[in-house]
Amino acid sequence: MKTNRYGGRKAIALSVACALMLPMAAVPDLAHAQSRSKKTTSREAALESRVNQLEQQLAELKAMIQEQKTQTTEAATTAQAAQVQSQQTEEKVAKVEKVVATVPPKPAFTTGTAPGVSLALHGFINASAFTQNKAYTYGNGANSEYPIPAGGANRADGRVSGVDVRNTRFWLDFTGAKFNENWAGSGRIEMDFFGGFNGTGAYAGSQPELRMRQAYMDIANASTGTTFRIGQMWDLMFPLDYIPQSLSHIAFPLGYGSGVIGWRFPGAIWMQELNHGSEGTKWRFDMAVLQGSWNGPGANATTNYQTAGNAGFKPQVEARLTAKGGNWQAFVAGHYSKVDLHGVDGLTATPIKSNLKSTAVELGGLWTPGKFIFKSVVYTGNAIGEVFGDLSQFGDIKDKGGYLQAGYKFDPHWTVYAFASVSKPDENDVLRWRAANTPGLLKSRQKAASLQYTTGPFDFSVEWIHANLDSTTTNGLGRQKTAGNELTLNGNYRF
C-alpha cells in the first residue's frame, strides 16, 4: 500500500513537471515564429513600396500616352487643315491660270539685229509750286537761275507764281546686246519736258513739249573695265555725280551757269578703269571728243550746225580723272576747243578777234562722313560760254566760280541742305565783248536752303533760293545790282 501511494505521488509529480516543462519547450518555437513574422512584415512593406512606385510609373506612362494621343490628334487636324488650304490654293491657281490663258500674250521685245536685248523704263514725276518776286534768266519756275537786270529782255519786277511739271523725266535703258565675245552693248534714251510750249495761245502754258536730253550707246568690256560711249551725253565738265540736291531745280540745277558748268553734246567718250579689279581707291580716266558749239555768228546760226564751233573740224576735247573711295570721291577735268568766229561760210566780220581758244580746268568732290553730305566744285576758264560758263556770255572772257552744298540727314526720312554758288567773269573782258545796248553780267551769287522728306519712292521738300546779280547798265557805263527770291513746294515720285 505504501509502495502504491509513493508511486502515485511520483507519477503526479512527474506530470506536474512535464506540465511545467511544456511552456519552456514552446518558448523557442514562439521566438522563431515571432522572427518569421517580423521578416514577413518587412518584405510586405518593401513589396508594397515597390507596387506603389510601379503604379506611379504606370500613371506617368498613361499620362504620356494620353498627351501623345492629343498631340497626334492636333497634328492630324493641322495637317488636314493644311491639306484643305493647299487644295483651295491649287483651285485658285488653276482659276488664275485659266484666266491668264485667255489673255493674248504680249509681243516679245526684239530688235531683229540684237537678240536678247532687255528694256527698262525709269524716271520720275515732278511737280513744283513756286512764287518769285522777279523774272529770271533762262525762264521762271524750274529753270530760273538769276534775276534779269534792268534793261534785260523779258525783265519783270512783279511777283510770278505757278506750278511747274517740266522737270518730269523718263528714260529707256537697253541692255543685253552682244557686240562680240568680249564686248557687250547697252544704251539710253532720255527725255524731259523742257522743249518749250505748244504754241503761244491761251492754253500753251499747260502743254510743255518733250525734249531729248541724252541718246547714246555703250560698248563695254567687263574684263578690262573699258567702255566706249557714242551719241549725245553730258560732257566731262558737267559734275554729274556732284550736282547739288534739289527737287525744284533738276534739269537746271541750283547754280547752273552761276557756279555749275557743263552741257550735253554729241560725240564719243572713252572711259577706262585704271586699276580694274583691284582693292582700295578706284581710279578712272575719261576722254571725250565732242561736237563744237558756239552762239552765232548770226541770229540763225545756233542750229543746223552753223555755229562758229562747227566751222571746220574743231571738236571740243575734254579729259577727266576720277578717284573714288569708301565715302568720298574727287575729280579733276580739263576742256579745250578752238572757235572760228568767221563762221562756217568764213564771211562774218570779226572786229575784235577772228578766233579764240576755249579752255577750262575744274576740280571737285563729295564726302559723306556719317550723316553729313558735302559737295563742292571750283573752276577757272576762258571763253567757256559754250559750256554754260561766263554767265552764258560768249566771247574771250575769263571766268572763275564754283559751289558748295552741305547736308545733314536727321534720319532715313528727313534731310536739310544749304547751298551757295558764285560765278565772276572778268569785268574788262565782259565790257569788251558785251553786246550793244545790253547789260553786261559781272557777278552772280546764289544761296539756297531746303528741308526734304523722303519715304520709299516719294520725295517732298520746301526750298528757298536767293540770287544776287551785279551787272552794267545797258550803255556799259553804270553799275547795278539785282536781287530775287524764289520759294517752292515740291513733290517727286521715282519709278
Name the predicted role of every residue range.
Residues 135-140, 198-208, 241-247, 295-313, ...:
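Outer-membrane beta-barrel translocator domains and adjoining extracellular loop/strand segments
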Residues 2-31:
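Gram-negative bacterial Sec-dependent N-terminal signal peptides
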Residues 290, 391-393, 490, 495:
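Membrane-topology and secretion signals of cell-surface/extracellular proteins
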Residues 312, 323-441, 445-446, 453:
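Detector for outer-membrane/organellar transmembrane beta-barrel domains
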Residues 107-147, 152-295, 313-314, 318, ...:
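Outer membrane beta-barrel
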Residues 453-455, 481-495:
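Outer-membrane beta-barrel "beta-signal"
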Residues 450-464:
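C-terminal closing repeat unit and adjoining cap/tail of repeat-based domains
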Residues 18, 30-138:
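N-terminal periplasmic/intermembrane-space "pro-region" immediately following the signal or transit peptide
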